[in-house]
Curated annotation (Swiss-Prot):
Lineage: superkingdom: Archaea
Any one Gene Ontology cellular component term annotated for this protein: cytosolic large ribosomal subunit
HAMAP family: Ribosomal_eL31
Record keyword Amino-acid biosynthesis present: no
A Pfam family per the record: Ribosomal_L31e
Name of the protein: Large ribosomal subunit protein eL31
SUPFAM superfamilies with a match to the protein in the record: Ribosomal protein L31e
Source organism (scientific name): Methanosarcina acetivorans (strain ATCC 35395 / DSM 2834 / JCM 12185 / C2A)
UniProt similarity note: Belongs to the eukaryotic ribosomal protein eL31 family.
GO biological process: cytoplasmic translation
Statement: the UniProt record of this protein carries the keyword Manganese: no
GO terms, molecular function: structural constituent of ribosome
Entry keyword set: Ribonucleoprotein, Ribosomal protein
Amino acid sequence: MADDMVKEQIYTIPLREVRKVPAWKRANRAVIEVRGFLVRHMKTESVQVKLDKSINEHLWEKGCEKPPLSIRVRAVKFADGEVQAELAQ
């Protein structure tokens, strides 16, 4: 699995724009924003971006109305174009 790894990067993803949507949609929108950021910066399609459970738990930690303003993510892109992302330590 390490042989076909192409690119590994740690990103700080800003989620300030999520505060502009209705409160009950914010955590859902944050997941969409994280996926969109990774699609843009890792140059892949959205169906090939896999978010780890830890990212989802961090975004939903304070409920759907109060996601964090930013999140640090470690993203790994493989040779087949798939991107796996997990919460950076």
